[in-house]
């Protein structure tokens, strides 16, 4: 528009055109020079950045340090939890809904403080022995960093002390070459991931995929403040309706509510895992993996592996006290359903966070070797009849903190390939 207007002005328009052209030429020349210099600088910066990127990520090893598709392929590397500095969680609604009524006075008295010192000392010794035996069986063992879980922390929505780093199965799940951090539902576990970060960063630098699921705010809306605690009948009724102490306010799940069988992963809606959390996993893992929701006759579900533990291709231990509602799905696929014997743990042994059925919470080292409690003779005999060698370890005091061998571990690498066992 400026050029047209100048042309209409006669000779002064021509002079204007000449003037503007000369200025434009100088401007363009300067722009080209600056652009060229900028391009050179950007190219150099890009080269430096690429070199830095290459230095950070290359060369990648041929074999990823993280690789596991199921619960039974030959175990090569595992994370084993720590009992050190374990703290009794504050007695909040989500803890109350997940614990036995006879232990509520214990939580009310000791919440926010360390578990009994002598008991922890015994548990630490048991887990050290477990680690030594795993190493003797040829398995690489990694441990989380020691942390003082008694420290109080505060977010905009709540304040709490911590719990422990005893159960890596609760917070971590490996699917193929990816390690996923779970968005757990207990407020006392909000910062539990910190104990595992140095291990996971090492795996990431060596080529593994690392995903952290959306962390919940754990605001009051995540919990049903009126959840019926005392009535088992009400709990059964609500569980059948898919209602638990956690709401659908935001996704949450414990990794221990998922169990893997190649392309098929089975999950339960529980007191700590909601449907939004399961849906997040379903979308995240699709289309290579299929996430199936299964349920059990269980008024207080929390973690699937002491209820439904897959120990081999098409072989599952199914808790007789908590039968699976979808068991026909597995029978039609030709799976072998094994009913484990009743556990023999004494009634007076403290189980602050679990049931006696930790006896079936075993760790498969491969299809023919299983790590099992040294005290649980009936289930040892069951495995021996199946042709599976039992590796006996005593972790009775470690059981009190809420887990068996499967809970106390996260299998990082198993020697195997992705297959389908349900088709």
Curated annotation (Swiss-Prot):
Pathway: Amine and polyamine biosynthesis; creatine biosynthesis; creatine from L-arginine and glycine: step 1/2. It is an enzyme of class 2 (transferase). The modification N6-acetyllysine is found at residue 385. It catalyses: L-arginine + glycine = guanidinoacetate + L-ornithine; 4-aminobutanoate + L-arginine = 4-guanidinobutanoate + L-ornithine; beta-alanine + L-arginine = 3-guanidinopropanoate + L-ornithine; taurine + L-arginine = taurocyamine + L-ornithine. The modification Phosphoserine is found at residues 46, 49. It comes from the Eukaryota. The keyword Transferase applies. GO terms for cellular component: mitochondrial inner membrane; mitochondrial intermembrane space. Residues 1-48 form a transit peptide. GO terms for molecular function: amidinotransferase activity; glycine amidinotransferase activity. One of its GO terms (biological process) is muscle atrophy. CDD domains: amidinotransferase_AGAT-like. The active site is at 254, 303, 407 (amidino-cysteine intermediate). Residues 39-65 are annotated as: Disordered. Residues 52-61 have a biased composition (Basic and acidic residues). Residues 39-51 have a biased composition (Low complexity). It is found in: Mitochondrion inner membrane. Belongs to the amidinotransferase family. Transamidinase that catalyzes the transfer of the amidino group of L-arginine onto the amino moiety of acceptor metabolites such as glycine, beta-alanine, gamma-aminobutyric acid (GABA) and taurine yielding the corresponding guanidine derivatives. Catalyzes the rate-limiting step of creatine biosynthesis, namely the transfer of the amidino group from L-arginine to glycine to generate guanidinoacetate, which is then methylated by GAMT to form creatine. Provides creatine as a source for ATP generation in tissues with high energy demands, in particular skeletal muscle, heart and brain. Homodimer. This is Glycine amidinotransferase, mitochondrial. It comes from Pongo abelii (Sumatran orangutan).
């Amino acid at each position: 528009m400026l050029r047209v207007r100048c042309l209409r002005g006669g000779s002064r328009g021509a002079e204007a055109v000449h003037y503007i052209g000369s200025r434009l030429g100088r401007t363009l020349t300067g722009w080209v020079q600056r652009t060229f210099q900028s391009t050179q600088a950007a190219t150099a910066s890009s080269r430096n950045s690429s070199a830095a990127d290459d230095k950070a990520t290359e060369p990648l090893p041929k074999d990823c340090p993280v690789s596991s598709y199921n619960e039974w392929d030959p175990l090569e590397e595992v994370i084993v939890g720590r009992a050190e500095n374990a703290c009794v969680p504050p007695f909040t609604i989500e803890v109350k809904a997940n614990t036995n009524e006879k232990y509520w006075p214990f939580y009310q008295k000791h919440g926010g403080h360390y578990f009994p010192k002598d008991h922890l000392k015994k548990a630490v010794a048991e887990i050290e022995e477990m680690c030594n035996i795993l190493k003797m069986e040829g398995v690489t063992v990694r441990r989380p960093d020691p942390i003082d879980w008694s420290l109080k922390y505060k977010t905009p929505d709540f304040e709490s002390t911590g719990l422990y780093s005893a159960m890596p199965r609760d917070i971590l799940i490996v699917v193929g070459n990816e390690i996923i951090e779970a968005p757990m539902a207990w407020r006392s576990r909000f910062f539990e991931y910190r104990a595992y970060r140095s291990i996971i960063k090492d795996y990431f630098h060596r080529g593994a995929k690392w995903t952290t699921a959306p962390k919940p705010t754990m605001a009051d809306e995540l919990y049903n403040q009126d959840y019926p605690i005392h009535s088992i009948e009400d709990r059964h009724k609500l569980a059948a309706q898919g209602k638990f102490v956690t709401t659908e306010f935001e996704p949450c799940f414990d990794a221990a509510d998922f169990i893997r069988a190649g392309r098929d992963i089975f999950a339960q809606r529980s007191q700590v895992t909601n449907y939004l959390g399961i849906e997040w996993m379903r979308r995240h893992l699709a289309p290579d993996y299929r996430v199936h929701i299964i349920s059990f006759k269980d008024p207080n579900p929390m973690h699937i592996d002491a209820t439904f533990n897959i120990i081999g291709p098409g072989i599952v231990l199914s808790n007789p006290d908590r039968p699976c509602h979808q068991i026909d799905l597995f029978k039609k696929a030709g799976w072998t359903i094994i009913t484990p014997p009743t556990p023999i743990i004494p009634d007076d042994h403290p189980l602050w966070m679990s049931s006696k059925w930790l006896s079936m919470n075993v760790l498969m080292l491969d299809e023919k070797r299983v790590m099992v409690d040294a005290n649980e003779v009936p289930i040892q005999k069951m495995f021996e009849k199946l042709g599976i060698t039992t590796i006996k370890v005593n972790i009775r005091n470690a059981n009190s903190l809420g887990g068996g061998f499967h809970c106390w571990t996260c299998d990082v690498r198993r020697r195997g390939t992705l297959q389908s066992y349900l088709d």
